């Protein structure tokens, strides 16, 4: 088996579950040493680390609340102490609230934008300062910014901001050979998928199913390798034809 990321190092925020977990496992399967960033669920993060270790890989988990700049700095410090200077950063941490905009509170706004926008901002800021030349930055967005789901105004607004971070940062880091891209999944089997939407979501795809986290991870794995060297500043749809 080929290991296109052998000798590379990666940090994945929100890496303990769902799409982040799948990306962590995928990059590790390609030979990368992986650090998992998580907020609350230590048990899940440790499970990912164990799964990677059992397969012969190197991994570690670090708790951090990325809405606080000092926590982002600490996460990167711990990652570098564990695996060395970073080649790949995946900003995947996210939260969602589903309710009409008129019913959203300031607390809802702060919670969603703290995680999805501010947390990504601080992650990208540290990545821009620390990533090796020729590195990779991958940001999780959502196909919802193209599909316009009602009740997700805060979530979609927070992700729309992130997509613009990607476009601007790709130009800021291009002279160092660093690629910066977003992935926008369609409906995917994660904790965010509500049972009442599952059948309708599956019908949006020509494949008549919702995505598996591994489907999204495959796109990240491509972007992280040398094969993705000429792709930057893009928001790549991974929705199984749903948009």
Identify the meaning behind each predicted range.
Residues 100-101, 105-113, 201:
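Substrate-binding pocket helix/loop in short-chain dehydrogenase/reductase
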């Amino acid at each position: 088996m080929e290991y296109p990321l052998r000798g590379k190092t990666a940090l994945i925020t929100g890496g303990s579950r769902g799409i982040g977990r799948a990306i962590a496992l995928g990059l590790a399967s390609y030979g990368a040493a992986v650090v998992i960033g998580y907020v609350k669920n230590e048990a899940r993060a440790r499970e990912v680390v164990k799964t990677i270790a059992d397969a012969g890989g190197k991994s570690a988990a670090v708790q951090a609340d990325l809405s606080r700049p000092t926590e982002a700095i600490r996460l990167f410090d711990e990652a570098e102490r564990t695996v060395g200077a970073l080649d790949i950063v995946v900003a995947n941490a996210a939260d969602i609230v589903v309710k009409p905009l008129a019913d959203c509170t300031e607390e809802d706004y702060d919670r969603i934008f703290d995680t999805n926008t501010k947390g990504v901002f601080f992650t990208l800021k540290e990545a821009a300062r620390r990533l090796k030349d020729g590195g990779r930055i991958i940001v999780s967005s959502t196909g919802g910014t193209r599909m316009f789901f009602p009740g997700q105004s805060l979530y979609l607004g927070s992700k729309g901001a992130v997509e613009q971070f990607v476009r601007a940062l790709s130009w800021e880091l291009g002279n160092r050979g660093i690629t910066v891209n977003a992935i926008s999944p369609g409906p995917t089997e994660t904790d965010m998928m509500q049972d009442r939407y599952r059948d309708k979501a599956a019908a949006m795809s020509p494949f008549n199913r919702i995505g598996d986290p591994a489907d999204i991870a495959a796109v990240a794995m491509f972007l992280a390798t040398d094969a993705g060297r000429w792709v930057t500043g893009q928001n790549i749809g991974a929705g199984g034809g749903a948009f």
